Amino acid sequence: MSEDHTKADNLSEKDPHSPERSDSSSHEDAHAREEEESSDDDGALDGKPASLIAIVMIALSLIGLQLAVFLSALDTTIVTVALPAISAHFNSTAAYTWVGSAYLLANAASTPIWGKLADIFGRKPMLLLANALFMIGSLVCALSINVGMLITARAIQGAAGGGLLTLVDTIIGDLFSLRTRGTYLGMIGGVWAIACALGPIVGGAFTSSVTWRWCFYINLPIDGLAFGIIFFFLKLKTPKTPILEGFAAIDWAGSFFIIGGTLMFLFGLQYGGITFPWDSATVICLLVFGVVCIVLFGLVEWKFARFPIIPLRLFQYRNNCGALLVAFFHSFVFTSAFYYLPLYFQAVKGATPILAGVYILPAVLSTGVSAAATGAFIGNTGNYLIPMYFGMSMMILGYGLLINFDAGSGWAKLIIYQLIAGIGNGPNFQAPLVALQTKIKQSDIATGTATFNFVRNIATAISVVAGQVLYQNQLKKMTSTLQQLGPAASLIAAGDAGANTQAINALPTPQRDLARSAIADALSPMWIMYTAFAAAGLFCILLVSKTELTTTHEVTEVGLEAQKKAEAERKAERQAKDLEKAQKS
């Protein structure tokens, strides 16, 4: 897109967050007004001051939203230290890979759909649906009698989890002004970071003390509480969209191509070099057809979709592309710490599952604190660029230091390096989302947020696969050295060290030390890769522009009629631009 065209877009389209477009001077008033318009029964609240009602409802709603995000994030990592026990229970090393990957793959593939569903049917109904699906998936996981049943249930969890995070971020964007939402998005980011980091600790505690099934049972009461709070206290206007008409408006072709393309591409990465050689027909076909489907998805969104899942107009600004790239690289790097640090502590340091979770507490605490502090900083200053630069710089330093983790690393090094990496993790959970929302209309908040989280989820899934591939391929290069381990050599050389940590700990001391050193050496190139990706993310921040965050609020219209109205407005804008160009020529 040319620079002149971009300027024309900027001139013809007012800042969607400008005071002239604001419908309210405070989010409390907007929230109270939505209560009046909502189909929910608010009669029990009559007679109370509106401002007090708004404050109470917002506080309770935020608790419910944070619980929903906590669940989605917790299940991203809770199984990481439980995977060896799950693999042993089902006598399946494949479970070590697929129980974790099924959640991430489904999470990534489903995310774009939730944003458009929320636009058509409303935020609250879709959030409740995601909660219900997550509860069903959790129950089936806990009751699984074979690995196939468990993997399928994890996929259901993943699809629902993608909706939980996307819809919560969207609702925050609906309720608060740009300046204010930075604080609340920071809170959500802090909850997400802490839950991701607590996952291995909670999973390790259940695996060691009770059973791995409690990694899924624990979701049921939390999910039930979140569902109840959201149902009774989150007051949002729900459109009365006819079910059949609403489903007819969904971009089914785009949904098919984005889900199919995402899954095929990620399956190709998952299989490559492990299950099948990289040059095998299976891997090549999956990768090629996955890319083809994604290209076809772009074509459908551009030319055919009336209500696109990922509208291409989101990418017309350099700022938006930069924010999405920063989100991609941040997620790619952040994910590695909470997937592979537990592996390091179990396989190299000989820790039990619960201790592996405890040993990553320095990264847990520093990540959560820095994420929440970033939200407060953005809310107070309106500046989101400083946290982005600071966070990525600290990630480069922190993950670069992790390269030095070896079998003999002392506790001072293990703690300090994790603290630095964790401080770098926090700032870019939500700062790029704030940057993205400065250049999109309020009517595009849901699709923009869904696109943002889709990019993050794709990065997470690719990160886990890329780390596994690099780690396992490094171990294969050490086959001759590992032959000294006897029967255990084949397990480690095949990349199954994570699923066989107990076998490694049972080796005689000389062989055990050799195995642990080999695993640490295999992890080192992986940290080099993640450090390089953090550096790439730092450069991408240069694409992000500085925009003043407004303190005014605009109420988001949802429903099929609102979608039609927004589309008509965009069509009128395009026609006005074309007419202006014709007059100039």
Curated annotation (Swiss-Prot):
Q: Which PROSITE patterns match?
A: MFS
User: Membrane-crossing residues?
Assistant: 51-71, 94-114, 132-152, 158-178, 186-206, 214-234, 247-267, 280-300, 323-343, 353-373, 385-405, 414-434, 449-471, 524-544
Domain of life, per UniProt, equals: Eukaryota
What outcome is recorded for mutants in which this gene has been deleted?
Answer: Decreases the expression of ver1, pksA and vbsA, and subsequent production of dothistromin, but does not affect the resistance to the toxin.
Subcellular location(s): the record lists: Cell membrane; Vacuole membrane
SUPFAM superfamilies, A to Z: MFS general substrate transporter (SSF103473)
Q: Specify residue ranges for compositional bias: Basic and acidic residues.
A: 1-34
Name the keywords, alphabetized: Cell membrane, Glycoprotein, Membrane, Transmembrane, Transmembrane helix, Transport, Vacuole
The record gives the membrane topology as:
Multi-pass membrane protein
A Gene Ontology cellular-component term: plasma membrane
Q: Name one GO molecular function term.
A: transmembrane transporter activity
State what this protein does: Efflux pump; part of the gene cluster that mediates the biosynthesis of dothistromin (DOTH), a polyketide toxin very similar in structure to the aflatoxin precursor, versicolorin B. One function of dotC may be to transport early-stage dothistromin biosynthetic intermediates from the cytoplasm into vacuoles, thereby affecting the rate of dothistromin production.
The record's comment on protein family reads:
Belongs to the major facilitator superfamily. TCR/Tet family.
> What is the designated name of this protein?
Efflux pump dotC
Q: Give the source species.
A: Dothistroma septosporum (Red band needle blight fungus)
Q: Which lineage ranks, top first, belong to the organism behind this chain?
A: Eukaryota, Fungi, Dikarya, Ascomycota, Pezizomycotina
